[in-house]
């Protein structure tokens, strides 16, 4: 048995919003990652943005809670004034909203890639960070 742990993927608001909408293909892909031992980071504020986007959907919260219950999923909270200051700086330099800025701030300090459905939205903001994150775009969860 190997002690290797893959580098975690940070899920952006778009990925979480599609999970909250019940995208079965995307949920299946994330389940496959979890079964393979791939850690998935769920930024708490990105989850907030996903729930705001899916407001009115009776299953949105349950779907995100299900994702958070995966064996290799970790919900990353915003913890304290120091992290709040880092988030504020990230928002200021990238122009991202608070939801995706939370994902970017985590990526900037952890050197973990961001998993997204829309890589283009990350191109410019990534350049503004001290440690530009690697962006992984899901182009077709069926493949």
Q: Predicted segments — roles?
A:
Residues 49-50, 86, 124-125:
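Phosphate- and divalent-cation-binding pockets in alpha/beta enzyme and binding domains
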Residues 1-42, 52-66, 142-143:
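Short, well-structured N-terminal submotif of metal-dependent ribonuclease cores
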Residues 42, 98, 116-117:
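Short beta-strand scaffold positions
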Residues 36-39, 72-74, 108-113:
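Short active-site oxyanion
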Residues 2-4, 108-143:
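Acidic, PIN/NYN-like endoribonuclease modules and their adjacent C-terminal/linker elements
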Residues 70-93:
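Acidic catalytic patch
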Residues 97-113:
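Acidic, metal-associated active-site segment
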Residues 15-16, 46, 102-103, 120-122:
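Alpha-helix capping/helix-boundary segments
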């Amino acid at each position: 048995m190997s002690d290797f742990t893959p580098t975690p993927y940070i899920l952006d608001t778009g990925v979480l919003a599609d999970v909250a909408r019940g995208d079965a293909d995307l949920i299946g892909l994330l389940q496959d990652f979890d079964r393979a031992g791939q850690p998935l980071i769920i930024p708490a504020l990105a989850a907030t943005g996903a729930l705001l986007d899916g407001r009115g959907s009776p299953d949105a919260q349950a779907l995100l809670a299900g994702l958070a219950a995966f064996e290799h999923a970790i919900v990353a909270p915003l913890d304290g004034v120091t992290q709040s200051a880092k988030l504020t700086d990230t928002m200021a330099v990238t122009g991202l909203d608070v939801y995706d800025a939370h994902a970017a701030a985590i990526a900037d300090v952890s050197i973990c890639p961001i998993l997204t459905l829309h890589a283009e939205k990350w191109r410019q903001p990534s350049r503004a960070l001290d440690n530009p994150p690697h962006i992984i775009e899901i182009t077709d969860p069926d493949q």
